[in-house]
Amino acid sequence: DATFVPYSIFRDVQRGSSLPWHKDYTRPALLDFFLPARDSHAAAYYDWGTEKETQWKENYRLWMAFVNEYKNRGGRVTAGADSGYMYNLYGFGYIQELELLREAGFHPMEVIQSATLNAAEAIGMNDLIGTIEVGKLADMILMDQNPLKNLKYLYGTGDIKLNETNEVVRVGGVNYTIKDGIIYDARQLLEDVKKIVDEEKEATPNWESLMIQSIDR
């Protein structure tokens, strides 16, 4: 489990703190927790700049090369996000991790395998989950786009592109999640999260300043 995503913000703090989903899906309390702090390991970017980001980019180059070579030599790599700090948001952070595996040199199918079969094998449950086969649990996601073409389609908010009439449209996103035989409307679940965040915003008068502090650093 390479878990690239938690420290990836150190490569570009301004970008990581202003990712588009934070406005709608990150609770104010979590935004406050994400702000720079001298006494917090999870918010150590209180004096950050180009030199440190350049060092971290080189660190990631070496780290990714190692993980990719480990995979190429037969090592099993799984995907994990360790979300909850440094602007690494639950759900969204996991898809960021898949994109980082792709950046490391994994083929898109190897990325998907890291998140499915490899993970199931690592915990000794590949007889029940990890692949779609007769007799296995039907734990899966359903979507109308191909993530092998663009892993960003796996984000709850999908991705944007120009359509045939030159209009900007949003495509992708998971439509349904099936877990333990229960079908969940993934888009409705995401809307439920937004409502929870909106309710906390109403009870947090300074939430906009937290968002501004996240972006204007």
Q: What is the role of each PLM region?
A:
Residues 5-9, 83-86, 118-119, 147-148, ...:
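Solvent-exposed loop/turn segments at secondary-structure junctions
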Residues 1-104, 197-217:
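Active-site neighborhoods of metal-dependent hydrolases
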Residues 137-194:
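C-terminal cap of metal-dependent C-N hydrolases
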Residues 111, 127-130, 139-144, 153, ...:
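C-terminal or late-domain output modules
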Residues 79, 85-142, 171:
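Extended hydrophobic/aromatic segments used for targeting, binding, or gating
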Residues 48-49, 109-110, 155-156:
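Short, positively charged
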